[in-house]
Amino acid sequence: MWLLLVTSVLSAFGGAHGLFGKLGPKNPEANMNVSQMITYWGYPSEEYEVVTEDGYILGVYRIPYGKKNSENIGKRPVAYLQHGLIASATNWITNLPNNSLAFILADAGYDVWLGNSRGNTWSRKNVYYSPDSVEFWAFSFDEMAKYDLPATIDFIVQKTGQEKIHYVGHSQGTTIGFIAFSTNPALAKKIKRFYALAPVATVKYTESPFKKISLIPKFLLKVIFGNKMFMPHNYLDQFLGTEVCSRELLDLLCSNALFIFCGFDKKNLNVSRFDVYLGHNPAGTSTQDLFHWAQLAKSGKLQAYNWGSPLQNMLHYNQKTPPYYDVSAMTVPIAVWNGGHDILADPQDVAMLLPKLPNLLYHKEILPYNHLDFIWAMDAPQEVYNEIVTMMAED
């Protein structure tokens, strides 16, 4: 969506080549897949396909060990990383190795697994439905919590022989964790600790332009966005990332457009990596996922998707209205980091969440941080990642 703003500006002022400054050095990872990005930096990579109970085929990636500890071939503690909304596993590996959480954990001795939610670039297959069908896209974060997380975590536990794993979630990755671990006690028992970055349980106070979407009637949202994909990665995104936003005079425009949706923290964004960030983002989701977030923004509650009528809700939930999720039912030990300039996971929403967490181990608010700083900030290792490594080692 913010990319469209950039495109409009380019159209108004004419062409990206030459006029807006010379092109910066290109990073080859911008055009790589997940496994290629991992091996490019000298780390081992494994790729798996996990089939969910309802037939979705998820791409799951593994970094079994780091460059510094390859000689230790015994069992390692497992760290599972789950991305946020319209994102993918690449979020954890798009910075340099000393600034990317997946690589940092691998070098710290962890068996690192990267998940992908249904519908994104690396999980766009189903046993029964084609991605061209409406049926394929009839999901939101409800199904990610109900089917994707259990299938992926069970696969990892079986593959590694570890009974419990560490779970790191960002943005919507925390949302599906809250839902899955509060409604599925058997799954919750497999989680050592939950590390929540920019946690989202409610969006009552969000100031993001996405809030405006909640004011649009649902029937009109369907007219505007359709009933299939929302913000899939395409050629335009790739072009903007590799040919436009990497130009000296346009990186500021691109970063400001991004900040409008996620909050401002100009000094912490590595603009030299813009082509990698935009070469893999947005990674897409369903329009139903978008509609679900609009529903939450309007209600201010964490609630299952409203299928539109009492009859449809009865078919899905055996009740006329969508059930609410009770975060306080989650007993998994949790550590929380949030940003003071995050307009998606607003500090007021986080303040509402914290008292509901019965096993809160740690909370830190980083005042300058926006929503994306937790995955891309240049000082993320000092502010967040080193603390995660320390806490994992203590458990």
UniProtKB/Swiss-Prot annotation:
Membrane spanning stretches: none
Domain of life, source organism: Eukaryota
GO BP terms, alphabetized: lipid catabolic process; malate metabolic process
Domain AB hydrolase-1, first and last residues per copy: 81-376
Signal peptide: 1-18
Glycosylation sites: 33, 270
Pfam families: Abhydro_lipase (PF04083)
Enzyme class: hydrolase
GO cellular component, one term: extracellular region
Active site: 171, 342, 371
Disulfide bond positions: 245-254
Reaction(s) catalysed by this chain's protein: a triacylglycerol + H2O = a diacylglycerol + a fatty acid + H(+); 1,2,3-tri-(9Z-octadecenoyl)-glycerol + H2O = 1,2-di-(9Z-octadecenoyl)-sn-glycerol + (9Z)-octadecenoate + H(+); 1,2,3-trioctanoylglycerol + H2O = 1,2-dioctanoyl-sn-glycerol + octanoate + H(+)
Keywords recorded for this protein, A-Z: Disulfide bond, Glycoprotein, Hydrolase, Lipid degradation, Lipid metabolism, Secreted, Signal
Cell compartment(s), UniProt: Secreted
EC number(s) on file: 3.1.1.3
Entry keyword annotation includes Hydrolase: yes
Gene Ontology terms, MF aspect: malate dehydrogenase activity; triacylglycerol lipase activity
Predominant subcellular localization, coarse grouping: secreted
Purpose of the protein: Catalyzes the hydrolysis of triacylglycerols to yield free fatty acids, diacylglycerol, monoacylglycerol, and glycerol. Shows a preferential hydrolysis at the sn-3 position of triacylglycerol.
Family per similarity comment: Belongs to the AB hydrolase superfamily. Lipase family.
Entry-linked PANTHER family: LYSOSOMAL ACID LIPASE-RELATED
Name the UniProt record assigns to this protein: Gastric triacylglycerol lipase
